Amino acid sequence: MQILCLLLAALLLSFAWLSPFHTYPWVTFSSELTSFGASLILIAIFLNKNIKIARPQILMLVLTFIPLVQCGFGLITDFSVAFLSFSYLFMFWLMIVIGYNLSLQSEQRERIMLGASYLLFSISLISSIMAILQWLNLENHFDVVMGLRGSRPYANFGQPNNLATFLIVGLMGALYLYEKRKLTLWLLIPISSTILFATVLTQSRTSWIVCIFFFFYWIYKQYRNSPRFNFPKLLLWTAFYFVLAAYVLPLFTQILTSSIDTGVTQTASIAQRAGSGHERLGMWMQILHAIAERPLLGYGWNQTSIAVVESIQFNTVQVWFNSAHNVLLDLLVWNGVPLGLLIITYVALWLFWLSKNAKDMTSMIALLMVSAILIHALLEFPQRYAYFLLPLGFLLGLVQAQTPNLKSIVLNKNVIRCIGLMALIVFLLIWRDYKLFQDNSRLVFKGKQPTEEILGSSKILILTQFQKRLDWIALNPKTKMSEHDLSLLGEMVKNKATPYNLKKYTQLLVYNQKSKEAERYLLVLQRLYKQKISLAEIVELNNR
């Protein structure tokens, strides 16, 4: 039963990483759904077993309910924002617990790490081949590969930095297989070189930082261990990576451009990549100003966009963003400084304790996989994707199992059965809600009534933000509304500050004689999208 569940979970996770289906508006929905499906299958392993919850996870469980509490007190006005935030946090917590319980026996722990390494290594190779096809402009010949937009390949992840982080985690899997002598060098070296080249193709600056961190971490750890991957090999592979990035890729691009009919995607030089990306500094400065505006309670979980709109006078990057591109700043802006610092301090101390006790190769390499995702989270938002977040939790649980005798409480198998049943119901309802939204949104965009039904109802039950979107699209901006309704719509617009939403909400405000508020949203439109529209133009638009 356990082996079958692990295999099914691995298959679903593989699909999540390789899925080419990216549809509006939740572009990674298929990947998110299958990632949660994999987690449900792992829960099934414990339907007939009691499960231990170690002491570090007890406080973490309390923290997972913060979004629901914020919703109860009105800080988050949309139920689905709070519920999805809770769902991601709770499932992340549950993956830590499951990873811990599955790895309490040292032999089982090593087998699980070997299985994870094989999986990551093989999917990394497939993703690398996809990225190379995109670089060569050959992806259109393969239905299972996404078309490339831009100049940085991303395989089926849709985002180059996400691909780079995943490939680095896959390389850590290769390192574990090498240390455990599970694959021959004639397989490991060419496959790892292919993955490394695909990582270079992404031109991810995050991967440079991860590489430097790995270099020094491995030097520090090898003094207490005797790894096969010793310092000379470490130096050779690190140098190989930077030579590929600085010299080999531009040379290959130049040669292939003249010799292949389709040409190749032109890539930026390492100097160009190093000299770009300064807009993050502007984002961070604006978020710091936003935190200063609401230091005690913050803006609510996953509501960075509201902070951006409300601190628009400090915006210098002229771009809308719904993440601070730094998980620490996000935690502070969502929860306020006191609670945010408590969460950051607790998690940091736990991670430090895990690292301090990491003495075997399994823990060291699992922590390197974790570090790749966490470093990325300091510069972007991989934690918002279930295909990163849930494996991250599982790996952290596996590392924690290096100390199997932690004080813990035992959760009865009946509780696990209830959790599994509720999770399955929510899983099916979310699939239903999203499918219903997609079907009805097509009708609304055609000017028709949203009459599609699933299971005899057209009402969206959990994903309320999508129901609000349907109502918003169908709403005539020349509609009289109460102060309360206008305020609720304003929160929705701030949390999804697209040009369409900002402009339409401005029309609605003008029609309801809220000219001062309308001018403020026109300023937001100008600062974020460089679209300068006067109040008189909005009035004229309403008079048509």
Predicted regions and their residues:
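Alpha-helical transmembrane segments of multi-pass inner-membrane proteins
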Residues: 6-18, 34-44, 64, 68-71, ...
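Helix-loop-helix junctions and helix-breaking kinks within/between transmembrane helices
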Residues: 22-29, 158-161, 189-224, 248, ...
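Short aromatic-rich membrane-water interface segments that cap or initiate transmembrane helices
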Residues: 21-24, 75-87, 148-163, 272-276, ...
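TM-adjacent membrane-interface loops and short helices in multi-pass inner/ER membrane proteins
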Residues: 159, 279-321, 328, 335-341
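Hydrophobic alpha-helical segments of polytopic membrane proteins
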Residues: 178-251, 392-402, 413-421
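Flexible juxtamembrane loops connecting transmembrane helices in multi-pass membrane enzymes
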Residues: 214, 246-284, 438-448
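Transmembrane signal-anchor hairpin modules in multi-pass inner-membrane enzymes, especially those
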Residues: 1-84, 90-118, 177-186, 405-491, ...
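Transmembrane alpha-helices of multi-pass inner-membrane enzymes
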Residues: 215, 361-414
